[in-house]
Design a protein with these regions (language model features):
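Structural and coupling elements of P-loop NTPases
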Residues: 1-614
């Protein structure tokens, strides 16, 4: 079989923050790709602002490095299972993977998730043990953990015989030996291992064209762009080709531009052939999973199966009294268009209409997946309201089932009991408990996804920020009956509109924890605090102190107010109950009741109580 020895196509897969993006940066620096004296910023492949802030990779990036007359096409994939749709698409474009594992933390749930996807595609693995210079690093033990994981996931004999390279990407060093003293300031061992181990792509350029779209992009000048791999044949600018749609239909179009990848740039090219990773423009409604084929011999590549969404939320137009004040895009049409556009590029996302023309059911792979979408919309200038995340139930063999996840926790020993107790209350079942080094314990649980909604805040508080938790979808199993997780405490709800006063807050704070600062504008039905008891309380938070001729109202009370709690977006979503919304604008995140009017809310509560007594 003829191959193209000048090309290697690889993906980098790893758990969140194990250093894969830093590794790609170092490969760019040390290859023949960038001009001399050219400096690249840290985490260069993370172009999305949210990715930079959170230190996670959401969207797959592709780049290419030149080394010893070879072009190594590198795809950087997300390390979080919530973005698994991206991982699965990338696996179809490559012939091998670099599995990056932290020399201290070892294998983690998301490492398992992405590795499983790679092994299922029969890709050739290279294991990179990164951060070998980290305090407490245990590279040899971690290699054993990786081998155990390969065996557990059903790797074949060839995959089990994986080469290992030890690196410190932050320092730009690597070695074939686990001893940190053997590290040299070069990535040559890694480059050489890639060239030697990863199979070269098959060269069937003389056969009819097949190009598979794996990632979508958009450019104001050329419109929609399909990024993928040429699996067969050749493609040139000006060619008349056929787009094989997912619904079975065919559309002919002319290739207007082709782009190749070099370093961090996308450069125009005139021709590409089997094995190349390229971008194609010329067809406005091209979608992920579709095939660009030879016009005379059109043949589609089997579409990719993506794991289904497990979590859903209602997204709706903002109808609070403050609607339209802070956002640029506030109408139902604008929000719907943006959500539908997101669905075109994110194959893990599903957007469905509801009976309400101003609301949509948005389904995704997890809390992080959906919260990143909300944060993106917010930064783009959108206003919206969102409901509490809910799991997606499925009927399997006539039995109603819900999603369960594997939860892996590393916590200081003194918090182990509290963590076990808290997860047990959320119907988690402990599968394993391993005492680790440095006073740490590793816990493995199987827990229902709905029990994990809102758990991360509780977990971080419980472990004083020292605990590390990650979880990944495991399976659907029969629904746990007669159990309703969620916030157990009630809320403090504003009874009127105005500005919150220090004087009023002093009288209210004994009822619970305040969530806003003095001077914050509020409206009727807005949540201003968490009650210390189970019921909701309506409060007058705008009440002013009568002025005297001695001093102005509120001037001397500030020192007596406990510091209010300020929630992040994720914490706000976790806080919500069924009768509440989170109002999201470019400037603020507010919590509110679905029914704003106090009297209407009380009537609804009476009806619910009466119904429950029947």
């Amino acid at each position: 079989m003829k191959t193209r020895d000048d090309i290697r196509n690889i993906a980098i897969i790893a758990h969140v923050d194990h250093g894969k993006t830093t590794l790609v940066n170092e490969m760019l620096k040390q290859s023949d790709t960038l001009p001399e004296h050219f400096s690249i910023e840290d985490r260069a492949m993370d172009t999305n602002a949210i990715e930079r802030e959170r230190g996670i990779t959401i969207l797959s990036k592709n780049t290419a490095v030149k080394y010893d007359n070879h072009q190594i096409n590198i795809l950087d994939t997300p390390g979080h299972a919530d973005f698994g749709g991206e991982v699965e698409r990338v696996m179809k474009m490559v012939d091998g993977v670099l599995l990056v594992v932290d020399a201290f933390e070892g294998t983690m749930p998301q490492t398992r998730f992405v590795l499983k996807k790679a092994l299922e595609q029969h890709l050739t693995p290279i294991v990179v043990i990164n951060k070998v210079d980290r305090k407490g690093a245990r590279p040899e033990e971690v290699v054993d953990e990786v081998l155990d994981l390969f065996i557990e996931l059903g790797a074949d004999e060839d995959q089990l015989d994986f080469p290992v390279v030890y690196t410190s990407a932050m320092n730009g060093t690597s070695s074939y030996d686990s001893d940190v003293s053997t590290q040299e300031h070069t990535m040559k061992p890694l480059f050489d291992t890639i060239i030697k181990t990863i199979p070269a792509p098959v060269d069937n350029s003389d056969e009819p064209l097949q190009f598979k779209v794996a990632i979508l992009d958009y450019n104001d000048f050329v419109g929609r762009i399909g990024i993928g791999r040429v699996f067969r044949g050749k493609i040139k600018v000006g060619d008349n080709v056929t787009l094989m749609k997912l619904d079975g239909s065919k559309k002919n179009f002319r290739v207007t531009k082709l782009f190749g990848f070099f370093g961090l740039k996308r450069l125009e090219i005139n021709e590409a052939e089997a094995g190349d990773l390229i971008a194609v423009s010329g067809m406005e409604d091209i979608n992920v999973g579709e095939t660009v084929a030879d016009a005379e011999h059109p043949e589609a590549i089997t579409p990719l199966r993506i794991d289904p969404p497990t979590l859903q939320m209602t997204f709706r137009t903002n109808d609070s009294p403050f609607a339209g004040r802070e956002g640029k895009f506030v109408t139902a049409r604008q929000l719907e268009d943006r959500l539908k556009r997101e669905m075109q590029t994110d194959v893990s996302l599903k957007v469905e209409d509801t009976d309400d023309p101003g609301a949509w059911t948005v389904s995704g792979r997890g809390e992080l997946h959906l919260s990143i979408l909300i944060e993106t919309l917010r930064r783009e200038g959108y206003e919206l309201s969102v409901s509490r995340p809910q799991v997606i139930y499925r009927e399997i063999d006539g039995v109603m089932s819900e999603p369960f996840e594997e939860v892996q926790i590393d916590t200081p020993d003194e918090y182990t009991g509290a963590v076990i107790d808290s997860l047990s209350k959320r119907k988690g079942e402990m599968k394993n408990m391993e005492p680790g080094e440095n006073g740490q314990t590793r816990l493995i649980f199987l827990a229902p996804s709905r029990g994990l909604i809102g758990y991360s805040t509780e977990f971080m508080t419980m472990t004083r920020g020292y605990g590390i938790m990650s979880h990944t979808f495991e399976k659907y199993a029969p629904v746990i009956k007669n159990w309703n997780p969620g916030r157990q405490k009630g809320t403090l709800v504003s009874m009127n509109a105005g500005k919150a006063t220090t004087y009023a807050m002093m009288g209210i704070e004994s009822r619970g924890q305040l969530l806003i600062d003095p001077g914050t504008e509020v409206y009727e039905g807005m949540i201003v605090g968490e009650n210390s008891r189970e019921n909701d309380i309506t409060v007058n938070i705008t009440k002013g102190k009568n002025l005297t001729n001695v001093r102005a109202a509120g001037s001397d009370e500030m020192a007596h107010i406990k510091t209010p709690t300020h929630f992040s977006l994720e914490e706000s979503l976790e806080f919500l109950n069924e009768d509440e919304y989170c109002e999201v604008t470019p400037e603020n995140i507010r919590l509110r009741k679905k029914t704003l009017n106090t009297n209407a809310r009380e009537k609804e509560a009476k009806r619910r109580r009466a119904a429950s007594r029947k």
